């Protein structure tokens, strides 16, 4: 991570000193778009997995997670997996939102 941050800082210094560079700007825009698409694909896969549990247990994931966190559902392996998938999807959605705010 440190190497990446160092490179970004170097680019920032370069742009501040020499002005806007179309190639760098386009490359960064494409990189951001690629990462957003990557997040979309991961969220889509996790949402598909969550739908399986929602069909089996006839319950929305957000309702399930609230009940699970309150300890009302026990430690069934399905529930542990469902909870993990739900948390992973929510984390990815938060990260995607952060990345979108840079556009």
Model-derived regions, located:
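Amphipathic alpha-helical coiled-coil segments
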Residues: 32-46, 50-53, 85, 89-92, ...
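K/E-rich alpha-helical interaction surfaces of small helical-bundle regulatory domains
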Residues: 76-88
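Non-catalytic, well-ordered alpha-helical scaffold segments
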Residues: 9, 44-47, 62, 79-80
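Short E/K-rich amphipathic alpha-helical oligomerization segments
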Residues: 51-73
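Short, charge-rich amphipathic alpha-helices with coiled-coil/heptad character
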Residues: 9-33
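Surface positions of alpha-helical coiled-coils, especially the charged/polar e/g heptad sites
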Residues: 21, 28, 35, 42, ...
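Extended, helix-rich structural scaffolds rather than catalytic motifs
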Residues: 3-4
């Amino acid at each position: 991570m440190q190497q990446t941050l160092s490179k970004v800082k170097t680019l920032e210094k370069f742009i501040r000193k020499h002005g806007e560079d179309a190639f760098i700007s386009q490359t960064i825009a494409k990189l951001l778009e690629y990462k957003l698409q990557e997040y979309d694909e991961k969220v889509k896969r996790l949402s598909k997995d969550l739908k399986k549990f929602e069909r089996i247990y006839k319950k929305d994931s957000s309702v399930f997670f609230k009940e699970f966190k309150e300890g009302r559902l026990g430690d069934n392996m399905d529930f542990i997996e469902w909870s993990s998938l739900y948390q992973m999807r929510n984390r990815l959605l938060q990260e995607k939102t952060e990345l979108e705010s840079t556009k």
